[in-house]
């Protein structure tokens, strides 16, 4: 009974955290917030890197710090409180405090508001990195193997429902004004506080790694030892995950290509793609989660294989110029299948990272992997943006090659349940 209670408390906390992620989308809410305060347009380009890679890059350093510590509850609570403070700063200072201090129409007020939003987002991402690391250990210590994928699946399904609700709310609101932004801020703060209350009494201790003597090891030996950890299980996981990042990277290029193919069609719209993605999450997440509990590596492979097959079909359509002869609904269905595949790769990756190591080793493993992937996402994003002029055929070809390479080397990955 205790295990069931802990399981559902963790699920509720994950759902609330995912709700906050949805509400603080770098594609909708945050650009609208910058626009509402009149911030310079160049700041828009910093939102996604700060929001996504900003929460991944510091995890290796954080993991190294956590490695010699056994308590995970206090760092998690501290990071959640910090996130709440940065959310409050991000919305309340520019929308409520600054208008009383300066002329809201002034350039200086707009610039300062923009910098406060970006600084708060940076702090939020750093705090989120610690939350992510410690939550993995909370899941790993309180949920046995065979239950973790189920938890991820349930939380993702609920997040899919919430994303549909939020998308519908956004679509029916022709403008996201300051009042709605403040409601979103209030919703995020409520979700964070409730999540803290749900898990604050769940004590989590892991076996600290105190084998190495930090005082007698030279800096050179420390660097060599650190580099050597990027081998074996971790090396294959990072390499495969770097290839499978294409399951997510393909989405924006596919959407833009579809919108350009049918620019005047109301069915092929951003709202349709958001609904397709949310529906895919609802339909597939629980199934992927259950499969991950059986074999997380296989789940990653199947998800990536689905996206690879869609990539090949897209290449055929582009090469023979079939796009205009296809019914518009086929683009939405295609994106639905892409989203199903991405959910599989994502679910398998999460459970694999939880199951392959234990205790402080898990913290170190996940931290280094996430930092590496943060760098990979930035580099691939810059690379694909730089070669976008080459056309969709070249882009999708490179992504298909990346997925194929990842599928081949994924068989070198150690089975996490063995």
Task: Write out the residue ranges for each language-model feature.
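Juxtamembrane intracellular "pre-TM" segments in multi-pass secondary transporters
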Residues: 1-4, 205-240
